[in-house]
Amino acid sequence: VTGLLDLFGLAESAQLLSLSPPGWGGNLLRGLANSLQIALGAFGMGLIIGLFGAYGKLYGGPILRDLLAIYTTVIRAVPELVLILILYYVGTDLINKVASSFGYGRVEISGIVAGIWVLGIVQGAYATEVLRGAIKAVPPGQIEAARSYGMPPFMTMRRVTIPAMMSFATPGLANLWLIATKDTALLAIVGFAELTLETRQAASSTRAYFTFFLAAGALYLMVTLCSSVIFGWIERWARRGQPSLRERRQ
């Protein structure tokens, strides 16, 4: 194997990417694990915000709808890098000011928690619109039938609306998940050790920029391909019992 790598000039790259020192492969995998942790947390937080935000926009009062409209408009209008800087530093300062007002010392916020908080707020705005559109796509007769049976709003949401809207929401949510995995790279600007920052540090230390950034791109691509398979399975599961597009045309 070593001779084959030497033949193609890949021996040095393989050594740099090895999992044990002096290779940096272990650092890249740790960065990938941190990126996935933040992406999963932010995606989950965004789903919760989005679900309640969508219901608030559709069924809430005028004040609530206006506040949610401001939230989704501002988040979608401002570049995500600027939002990350604002939410990270302003949020940290606010928490420390509140803590000091109660007589506590400076609070050290975990990088993972801060990353989930920042990206979760961003994800929530987009998820609100995705889920709002999915809820509006549910045939009104299904929700009216649930109400006629005396189901309370929460039970109607849990047993009728959410299952019915899943087939409409899954493609948009899949895109949001992929955006979340890529947006973790923006956290490198605040010094969080995710995949992009680990890649930059490895490349700067070895001057092998092409090798490490190509490896990072391959890891991001692997996450995307695996995610596409998983969300494809979820979409097929959500559409079970429904006619396919070809059957509808016939």
Task: Annotate each predicted stretch with a short phrase.
Residues V1-Q250:
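Transmembrane alpha-helices and adjacent helix-loop boundaries
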